[in-house]
């Protein structure tokens, strides 16, 4: 069995291509089933987000597994197989495990260290698990990856430092006010940066937000999309009297908020703090306003300094996380190597205990007068003899797991002890056959 990951992401394809190879949420369950029924696939998880579409699979052979996954993606999105090859990267074995760990912990994201991908990986795994397309390998590996990412985030605080301008704007407001939930905010502008700022404000717990814009229709549209208030730009002076936070991002060629405007409303604010954050170029807010008591005025250079410093912190945290990945890969490989041992040891124990049971039956027939206490003593000692006899063979079997020729030696081991144990590959194939029947039956039932 082999682990393979095929990824279409921000490094391998531009956004125009990525848009064409994203699964709709309501199509993912069927996609999991379709891929699972494909030749060579023993387990699979499909991850589809705005920045990446990835297939993780356990396959019986690397070259056939890779081909059938690429063919599956080509058919799903109306491309040729060669197109999928050109826009994707393929990772196999340890590289595939490393890729999953890096993706889950946010090291492979456009925004280094972001945590949203962890939830997306978890959702993808849970969907695959509930659909029936995961098995022994992925049920262990994905839980390991999720646990690793959680621990990495907690130990390094990699996601605590803002690395986008819009997010940094909200972080600056938090430095002044602490918690923002009860604060009033104004968003000036209705473009992409304004919307990102609005989303970050909502994410911080603020619900009292007003969007103002020179074109009222655009303000109304953005406000309706996120269920907040809107107003005309001419209402800004009145709104400023009660606002706590203002984030401005327009393409205006003159100042929208001036010193004079702030001086007029300052008298009515009763010394309440006001945070003005200007992320426009050219600037929307007149410089020098911060000289007024309790008025905090930040521009894009202030934000850039914070973003740059935070990015350096994230890069250091990412390096720390990266150093931990080899140990995780080793732990996974150790676990996988033991998979072949477990059935052999189980078969050996079962045979030994069957012999012990037969021996006890023989003793019962030949010595019918034994008391219950005597019988328990004999049973205990015969089991002890068996455990002592099995101790060295079991130790040897475990040591064989790391041998490059373990399959051949396990076969010899089974022949010596006259036992039969199914290898993980055979178990996975049987498991797949059973699950494919369940999927087919489920589809028939749904159709009816």
UniProtKB/Swiss-Prot annotation:
Record-linked PROSITE patterns:
GLUTR (PS00747)
> Would the keyword Transport turn up in this protein's UniProt record?
no
Residues involved in NADP(+) binding = 189-194
**Residues at site: Important for activity?**
99
Q: Where is the active site?
A: 50
The record's section on InterPro entries has: 4pyrrol_synth_GluRdtase (IPR000343), 4pyrrol_synth_GluRdtase_dimer (IPR015896), 4pyrrol_synth_GluRdtase_N (IPR015895), GluRdtase_CS (IPR018214), GluRdtase_dimer_dom_sf (IPR036453), GluRdtase_N_sf (IPR036343), NAD(P)-bd_dom_sf (IPR036291), Shikm_DH/Glu-tRNA_Rdtase (IPR006151)
Listed pathway(s)? Porphyrin-containing compound metabolism; protoporphyrin-IX biosynthesis; 5-aminolevulinate from L-glutamyl-tRNA(Glu): step 1/2
The protein's matches in CDD domains, at most eight in alphabetical order, are given as: NAD_bind_Glutamyl_tRNA_reduct
Note whether Glycoprotein occurs among the keywords. no
Q: What class of enzyme is it?
A: oxidoreductase
What is one process in the GO biological process aspect for this record? protoporphyrinogen IX biosynthetic process
**Keywords for this entry?**
NADP, Oxidoreductase, Porphyrin biosynthesis
Record: residues binding substrate: 49-52, 109, 114-116, 120
- Coiled coil ranges: none
- To which protein family does this belong? Belongs to the glutamyl-tRNA reductase family.
What this protein is reported to do is described as: Catalyzes the NADPH-dependent reduction of glutamyl-tRNA(Glu) to glutamate 1-semialdehyde (GSA).
- Describe its assembly: Homodimer.
Extra information: During catalysis, the active site Cys acts as a nucleophile attacking the alpha-carbonyl group of tRNA-bound glutamate with the formation of a thioester intermediate between enzyme and glutamate, and the concomitant release of tRNA(Glu). The thioester intermediate is finally reduced by direct hydride transfer from NADPH, to form the product GSA.
Q: What is known of its domains?
A: Possesses an unusual extended V-shaped dimeric structure with each monomer consisting of three distinct domains arranged along a curved 'spinal' alpha-helix. The N-terminal catalytic domain specifically recognizes the glutamate moiety of the substrate. The second domain is the NADPH-binding domain, and the third C-terminal domain is responsible for dimerization.
Q: What is this protein called?
A: Glutamyl-tRNA reductase
